[in-house]
Amino acid sequence: MASIETPHHSKIETSVDVDVPALLEEYYVEDSIERFNLYRRLSQAVTDAEIDEWEQELQDRFGPPPESAYNLTMAARMKLCASGIGLVNVTVKSEAMILHCPDKDSETGKAFYDEGGFDKLLSKLEAAAGGQFKVVKENKRVKFMIRGLESLDSALEKLQAVSDGESTHVPIEQ
């Protein structure tokens, strides 16, 4: 898991979990050190353009990527988008996506809830997902569950619609 540095020097640690294979298969990139370097570069991407470049390099060097490599790229795009929103985790499984908000007592959580990030996210979710989501509070963390997603593509589309290119993350000054 990589942290993504925002212009205000706050770090959002975001992880993405998917229930489909999301990796560079050994038969596709045979050299283990090369696979490691490719994983590292992808985890350090901070823009969609960097992910696009990584994906193009993969195709140029190793040929058409298998579905597992495509899934890895989709997960990286989801991570980038979720980090900009201020989410700590995104889980996609069984045609559903769970968006995990930060813990209320954490530095990130205090800013997220007190400065309007949560309210922005909630209103964007209502517009993007309609009645197909529910809010679950678990301990000091809030989760949004979105149902009716057919693929990682549809999960990413929902996440991008919620993000709408505008960050709901409220940076923490250090």
Where are these predicted regions, by residue range?
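Accessory helical-bundle/CTD segments and flexible terminal tails appended to RecA-like ATPase motors
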Residues: M1-Q174
